[in-house]
């Protein structure tokens, strides 16, 4: 069955928020296989016309980060694929310009979906490029690329859905990325550019001057990217969906995580481009490019281009829930990181492991008989065995662990790490180029005290990759255990990689059966 978007009023060169919503709702009612075809061209979406939804998205925003009067987790989605099965969406190169803050794409309760040949371009987002054009001992002149104004010695950024004091203590404060003129391929997370500012004034339209007690932190030609760090809206969000493929999708900007999946199965991201629309802008994602949390099946990430992230390129992990109480065969477990809560990814029939938070080693297993989210932060589980459980231990859902293939990808302008991997199933990192990461290229972590991202690695191959620049050791094996009761990670092969790094390119802690060979 073939469906044409223009038959539902989704037409190029027009505002199509409501028409898109109607089209996607109609497609959800059709259970047979279908192909939806869009006309090539430019489409426009106004955020004010989008339907609001309550979305609890892992690793994004916690209740405490919202201001008084705001509704936590209230979210708008430009393209909301909800309850759709057996569908291929061919956007034929169509570009959607989103005016105002929104999650670009949401895929919720979907199955067997292909989304291809799509371009996503938020207009005038709340990030500003500030280029140093002159400096003295006590002041720096910046060229600003977007809308702003100066009021009472403070710098404000303004646009649809935002108007805030960027130079003041707004929420947790404005975040910054710093690209130095002498090393344009590298991006660094810097301190608050405005922390020591002694005043802001406008020299002429598009140019401001900030006074400082000293100006050694920058040079003429340096670029700073300043933005509000609230992770309220995502780029592409997938929840409780299965067999979802994104192919040839270009996403030019997103307000937090570019691609975030939770409680999904069998995901593919191929030949996609997450990067700025033009070369004169260098940031595309205000947080990680990818977060894959408590998914299962196979995660396939191949032939993609990632450029300009204000956090990691990709992170594959589970969640360490902390056991707060035990009553018979019932456990009350809690989300402990303030930016991850409000959803229940643990299902009846899942196998869980009881994990010592000190050693990060598994002490026993059980099967989930029932699972209920009792509030935003707690899940009540009935299990078949609590003999290895203890209050203060963590649990990891062993069923919700995928195999991972990350192959033939390019990662550049990454402000922290290239990859974080904490999955016990097979993970292959092969033939990628990590052009610039200000921290490690690949980190095998595991923690139950900070981000609570589980778990141990059981079979990892890191092969034929090029680590062109890493600000820290390129391959770092570092579980965050507090005591040593034995190796946490195992079966790791680091073979045939090229490291451009002064110092030891591999660091290993608490791992067994690790092979490092034929690297250069």
What are these regions (language model features)?
Residues 5-37:
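Acidic Gly/Asp/Thr-rich repetitive segments characteristic of extracellular carbohydrate-active
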